[in-house]
Amino acid sequence: MSANLARHGHAQPPLLLPGEENPAMTTPRAFPLEPRPIQVSDEVLADLRARLARTRPPVDEGNDDWSYGVPAGYLRGLVDYWHDGYDWRTAEAAINGYEHYVVPVDGIPVHFLRRPGRGPRPIPLILTHGWPWTFWHWSKVIDPLADPAAFGGDPADAFEVIVPSLPGFGFPGPLTGFPDVNFWKVADLWHTLMTDTLGYEKYAAGGCDIGALVTSQLGHKYADALYGIHIGSGLPLDFFTGPRAWDFARGRPLSDDQPAAIRARIIEQDRRWASHLTVHMLDGATLAHGLADSPAGLLAWLLERWNAWSDNGGDLASVFTKDDLLTHATIYWVTGAIATSMRYYANANRYPWTPSHGRTPVVQAPTGLTFVTYENPPGIHTTDERVAAFTSGPQATWFHHVNVSAHDHGGHFIPWENPAAWITDLRRTFHTRRP
């Protein structure tokens, strides 16, 4: 079930491979850059396998239920498969089914994937991922957004899809010369990329997690250059501001007179987010020394979040196959990106967001939002309640919201877990805002 404040669109069929589209729907457009495929060296992959072979697991008794974190036995199985069964070259070939580019933007090397739109008038759409995701977490929605007709949709809804890697999160490699990188500074890079580098006069934007904050900042600072934005959370842009921004509970008390269900939900969400925010904001560099040296340790840290944040019903394989997990982990490993990816959290607080103007709402670009009940606040149970809680609450005042939806299926990264819902919601946000 789902709830929204606008009319539903079409569910999407399974993805086609790149190259299977109807060429008659192509809208030619000269692109100003030459593609550059992803290629990880044999030496880097050999070093990865050697390190996996030398993995020394910790003593981990009494943890089969994940109550102490990732169980050693579960991780051992994935590490063995990473060493003996997983084939990065297969994943690399799938990734290279799309165009890839690396271009300097204000001196920062930026990698992005491009999928040309196929329709009468595609509009450019930049999609931004979060942590611990990579650009490849958008892979389930790229083709339907670029070529709606191939999936039973309206070709008038086509986008030219641009999917960058957040600097310091993956390709082209570790981020240097930008130690103060954070979400609002990336928004400036993205605007320069889309307008000055790629030559788009106007564009659309979407994002989840950190990517939602990047996208909201675009909608705040560069609203006149946007058709609109679509995001997977309604966090205010000052979410990481303040002396205790690492406290996910925001000082909410636990009292004996709270309803049991409310109390349980508060505790559940604190457990889901507390260690992530606290470590990344306070001493991420300390942890990074271990994660940068041990692929098994890196996988464990990522895996804890993929398991806790996905709507998997106790079965992680229902959301991510082993190959899915290891493709994303391999991107982090071969690029040496874990330390700089975690730096975004501390820097969002150390270099706090400040408004670029005093107009209200803060995010003036037309905004669509997609929520999932898996992340409902305490006391909110249904999709209708989730939509109502947002539209009547303080976060809504930040946004020029034009399309708010909630769905029963999906977790923290909705475009991966429920791509059909994300596609439908995003199309609805922009359907009447195209030229």
What residues fall within each predicted segment?
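C-terminal subdomain of alpha/beta-hydrolase-fold enzymes, centered on the catalytic histidine
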Residues: H280-P435
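Conserved acidic catalytic loop of the alpha/beta-hydrolase fold
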Residues: W184-Y203
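Non-catalytic accessory segments flanking enzyme active sites
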Residues: L45-G117, W333-G336, T340-P355
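Conserved HGGG/HGGXW glycine-rich cap/lid loop of the alpha/beta-hydrolase fold
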Residues: P120-P172, F430
